[in-house]
Amino acid sequence: MERLQGLLLWLLLSPSVVWASRGPLRPLCRPVNATLAAENEFCPVCITFTTSICAGYCPSMVRVLPAALPPVPQPVCTYRELAFASVRLPGCPPGVDPIVSFPVALSCRCGPCRLSSSDCGGPRTQPMACDLPHLPGLLLL
C-alpha cells in the first residue's frame, strides 16, 4: 500500500516538475515585435510599420473575498525604457505634417497601468487596421 501511495504521488508530481523545469507556461513581460498602422485624415494613404512593444504575462492576484476588501491593483506589462522613432506618411498635401512618431520598447517591466502612456484595455478582438487605403512598407526617418 505504501508503495502504491508513493507511485501515485510520483505520478501526480512528475508533470509539474517537467513543466517547472521548462519555465513559465506564458511568456513573461518583454519587448516583442508588432506591426502597427499610421494614418492622418489629411493624407491619402495609411502605412504599416514594425516596432517593438511591451507584451507578456505579469503575475497577479485576485482576492478570495472581493466584497470584504478593496480590489488589488493588477500589474500590466509596460515600458521600462523607451525611445521614439518616426515614419513619414507619403502624399500629404503642403501644410500637413507627414511625420508620425511612435514609442519603441527597449525594456519592459510589470507595473501599474499609466493611462497617460499605455493602452490598458486588454487584448483586442480585431487588430488595428487602416481606415484609408493601405500602402505596404515603411518610410523610417
From Swiss-Prot:
It is found in: Secreted. Residues 1-20 form the signal peptide. One of its GO terms (cellular component) is extracellular region. CDD domains: GHB_like (cd00069). Glycans are attached at N33. It comes from the Eukaryota. One of its GO terms (molecular function) is hormone activity. Promotes spermatogenesis and ovulation by stimulating the testes and ovaries to synthesize steroids. Belongs to the glycoprotein hormones subunit beta family. PANTHER family: GLYCOPROTEIN HORMONE BETA CHAIN (PTHR11515), LUTROPIN SUBUNIT BETA (PTHR11515:SF11). This is Lutropin subunit beta. It comes from Mus musculus (Mouse).
